Amino acid sequence: RRVLIAQFLKDGRSGELAALKTFERATVYPAKPISGFVFAMTAAQKEEAAKQQNAQAADIQGEAEGLRPALTVLDELNVALACGMVTRENAERLIDAALAFGDVVSTGRNAPEWLRERADYVSEIVARKHPFQTEKLAAREGIEY
């Protein structure tokens, strides 16, 4: 059985990608890099990033339809929806396509209610303590990316 793992809002260099690519039955669709954090983008950068992320959602939908995975993991889709980088319509099309073949996992904070009702799994990791908060450390190579 096949697994499709697709990322949103990441730069394609995250540490989990290397590990995931070692799994024979997993197809990894890395995020198309966006320039910086959404909260720090100009209006023009947000518009361009949203176009790119919506196009990526359509590409992932096509990948799911071709691969027919038993499990599709949509990493950070919840965040992409919450910050307006992916439209509800595009997310629904992607989720529906993936659900036709198996289960769907959608990760990230702020999942909208409609997605929580629709997806098979919705997960969110909450940082109770993190050096970013306590020591004002930036993301570190080998740890956060």
State where each predicted segment sits.
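Conserved P-loop
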Residues: R1-E65
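Conserved ATP-binding/catalytic motifs of P-loop helicase motor domains
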Residues: A6, V104, P131
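Conserved nucleotide-binding/hydrolysis micro-motifs of P-loop NTPases
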Residues: L9-G12, I34-G36, N78-A80, N110-E113, ...
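Short, electropositive alpha-helical surface patch
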Residues: E16-L17, T22-E24, T87-A97, V122-K136
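Phosphate-binding/switch loop-helix module in NTP-utilizing enzymes
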Residues: A40-A100
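Short, well-ordered beta-strand core segments
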Residues: T72, V104, V122-E124
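Sensor-1/coupling segment of RecA-like P-loop NTPase cores
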Residues: L94-P112
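Phosphate-binding/switch region of NTP-binding enzymes
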Residues: R109-Y145
